[in-house]
């Protein structure tokens, strides 16, 4: 097979994989820039005068800024607690060969998240925690905590044990060695895990739909405000969806090298 043919197959496959999601992304943005009449016209209008009225209405009529702040608070809390709990757990699995704990974490990742929904709802309803940041943060931890722990195991396994032994000979405790020796060496993994946890929490819909309320509604759930009986505000949905996806997409674009480095370096061992 010639080099030219390989390049054609490679780039052709890349275009085939990227074209569908890119088309949906562009269509979503165009929907938010059209009026309601233009969005339901047939055939679709591809040449039109864009308007920002839908984005203005999202903030003025639907209190969207509050929902953005709720998502930011919950995603930040879920990410922070995932790191605080997941890093020691991953270190224990990697250094003490806790295979059973690793299997439990893997099982948590494999279990459908919807299976946790009813027990959590009953517990939070009994404790009067529905529509609170506490309930949503705890449920988001079901997604983010196992992911952080599972990603970090490979990073901790790649740290040479001799470095920790040398630090402990110099008088460091196990905890101090973990904090000042090990964690700086796996900073790429920590950054990658934090970014992935934040994105997963930001995009979470099901738990937020059931457990949130007027005070803690997140942006994925807020899109429901544009759907009512007998009417769907496609322009509003397009504008709201763009506001949800665009910040995370821009953030992921700028940190893409960190994510790639983190996911690949964790697979390498000395």
PLM feature spans:
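A hydrophobic, multi-pass inner-membrane permease signature
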Residues: 1-270
């Amino acid at each position: 097979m010639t080099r030219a043919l390989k390049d054609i197959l490679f780039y052709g496959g890349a275009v085939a994989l990227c074209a569908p999601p890119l088309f949906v992304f562009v269509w979503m943005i165009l929907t938010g820039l059209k009026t309601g009449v233009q969005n339901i016209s047939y055939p679709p209008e591809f040449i039109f005068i864009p308007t920002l009225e839908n984005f203005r209405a999202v903030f003025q009529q639907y209190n969207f800024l509050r929902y953005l702040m709720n998502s930011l608070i919950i995603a930040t809390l879920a990410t922070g607690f995932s790191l605080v709990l997941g890093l020691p757990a991953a270190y224990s699995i990697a250094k003490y060969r806790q295979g059973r704990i690793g299997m439990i974490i893997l099982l948590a990742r494999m279990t459908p998240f919807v299976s946790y929904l009813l027990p959590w709802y009953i517990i939070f309803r009994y404790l009067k925690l529905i529509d609170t940041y506490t309930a949503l943060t705890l449920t988001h931890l079901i997604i983010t905590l196992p992911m952080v722990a599972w990603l970090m195991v490979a990073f901790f396994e790649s740290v040479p044990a001799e470095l920790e032994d040398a630090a402990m000979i110099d008088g460091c405790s196990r905890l101090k060695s973990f904090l000042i020796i090990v964690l700086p060496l796996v900073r790429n993994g920590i950054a990658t895990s934090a970014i992935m946890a934040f994105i997963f929490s930001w995009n979470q819909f099901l738990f937020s739909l059931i457990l949130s309320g007027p005070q803690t509604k997140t942006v994925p759930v807020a899109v429901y405000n544009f759907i009512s009986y007998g009417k769907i505000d496609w322009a509003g949905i397009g504008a709201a969806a763009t506001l949800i996806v665009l910040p995370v997409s821009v953030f992921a674009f700028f940190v893409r090298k960190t994510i790639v480095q983190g996911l690949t370096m964790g697979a390498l061992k000395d």
